[in-house]
């Protein structure tokens, strides 16, 4: 087994982790989609294409009112929370990461999963979305999923370093490189969480390793969950959606961004029930109704 993106697999503990996953775990069973057998991989790809050919709910109500946020509005809302409400940055990242993990459990409930389906590859970038991904991975471990993190371009930011330490202390594996053999990833993991790019972050800003990782993620046939926006998309228009990732699940953080109007995957959640009512009114947000004490709502 070889990889153009890394060292000799015979010397790589990460590759042995993939092999152990293949030896110990049964084939991926139905996750509300076609079974990912040799025949069903094609079936899932076809379903994904069919879903993306439909007009999304958000696109239908695009002109009905301010459901989606522009990048500037999202930044202004965050400033309002940080400066006026005295939220801490780490607090917001924690709230979003926890809610993202809850959204994953809603889309892929643990009792319905086989052991293999519980394995989750979380791919993190060096900006704030990557920090949310690190928190998401930690909470997935608490929820008894089996996350592994690929974090190719590590940020020197103290928050990122602290979150990385927390994951390491909880024995969450980190991959030093991502194999280029797509089928190896398909067979080793039940799903992938995309926390690579966030609103306003271009692929070129995060370095070659992240760009190469996105190219690999585009080829996967296992379910893909994107946090806030699908990596590679223009946050305003979704105009790069043809070249960016096409997730099966989108988890919008706090409120959907404008590009979410182009999302036509299987599940769309709004995660993070922390926006105060007067802030919601100030920014004219029409957020979904949450059930009980849930921090996640399905659209």
Swiss-Prot record:
Record GO terms (molecular function): NAD(P)HX epimerase activity
Expression (tissue specificity): Expressed in theca cells in ovary and in Leydig cells in testis (at protein level). Also expressed in brain and mammary gland.
Keywords linked to the UniProt accession: Lipid transport, Transport
Family annotation (Pfam families): YjeF_N (PF03853)
SUPFAM superfamilies registered for this protein in UniProt: YjeF N-terminal domain-like
GO biological-process terms attached to the record: hematopoietic stem cell proliferation; lipid transport; membrane raft distribution; negative regulation of angiogenesis; regulation of cholesterol efflux; regulation of Notch signaling pathway; sprouting angiogenesis
Signal peptide: none
GO terms for cellular component: mitochondrion
Occurrences of domain YjeF N-terminal (ranges): 74-287
NCBIfam families with a match to the protein in the record: yjeF_nterm (TIGR00197)
Role according to the record: May accelerate cholesterol efflux from endothelial cells to high-density lipoprotein (HDL) and thereby regulates angiogenesis. May orchestrate hematopoietic stem and progenitor cell emergence from the hemogenic endothelium, a type of specialized endothelium manifesting hematopoietic potential. YJEFN3-mediated cholesterol efflux activates endothelial SREBF2, the master transcription factor for cholesterol biosynthesis, which in turn transactivates NOTCH and promotes hematopoietic stem and progenitor cell emergence. May play a role in spermiogenesis and oogenesis.
Cited PANTHER family: NAD(P)H-HYDRATE EPIMERASE, YJEF N-TERMINAL DOMAIN-CONTAINING PROTEIN 3
Assembly and interaction partners: Interacts with APOA1. Binds to HDL.
Protein name: YjeF N-terminal domain-containing protein 3
Originating organism: Homo sapiens
């Amino acid at each position: 087994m070889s990889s153009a993106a890394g060292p000799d697999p015979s010397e790589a503990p990460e590759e042995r982790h993939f092999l152990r996953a293949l030896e110990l775990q049964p084939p991926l069973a139905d996750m509300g989609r076609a079974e990912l057998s040799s025949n069903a991989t094609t079936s899932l790809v076809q379903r994904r294409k069919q879903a993306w050919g439909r007009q999304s709910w958000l696109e239908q109500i695009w002109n009905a009112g301010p459901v989606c946020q522009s990048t500037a509005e999202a930044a202004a809302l965050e400033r309002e929370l940080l400066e006026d409400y005295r939220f801490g940055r780490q607090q917001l990242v924690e709230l979003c990461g926890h809610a993202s993990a809850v959204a994953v459990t809603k889309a892929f409930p643990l009792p319905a999963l086989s052991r293999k389906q519980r394995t989750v590859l979380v791919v993190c970038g060096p900006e704030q979305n990557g920090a949310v991904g690190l928190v998401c991975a930690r909470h997935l471990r608490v929820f008894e999923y089996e996350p592994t993190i690929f974090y190719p371009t590590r940020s020197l930011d103290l928050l990122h370093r602290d979150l990385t330490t927390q994951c390491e202390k909880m024995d969450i594996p980190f991959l030093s490189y991502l194999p280029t053999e797509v089928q190896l990833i398909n067979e080793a993991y039940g799903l992938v969480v995309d926390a690579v790019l966030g609103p306003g972050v271009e692929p070129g800003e995060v370095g070659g390793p992240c760009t190469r990782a996105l190219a690999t993620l585009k080829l996967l046939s296992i379910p893909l969950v994107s946090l806030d926006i699908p990596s590679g998309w223009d946050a305003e228009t979704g105009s790069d959606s043809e070249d960016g990732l096409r997730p099966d699940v989108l988890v919008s953080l706090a409120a959907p961004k404008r590009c979410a109007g182009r999302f036509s995957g299987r599940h769309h959640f709004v995660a993070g029930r922390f926006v105060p009512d007067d802030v919601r009114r100030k920014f004219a947000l029409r957020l979904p109704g949450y059930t009980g004490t849930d921090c996640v709502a399905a659209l």
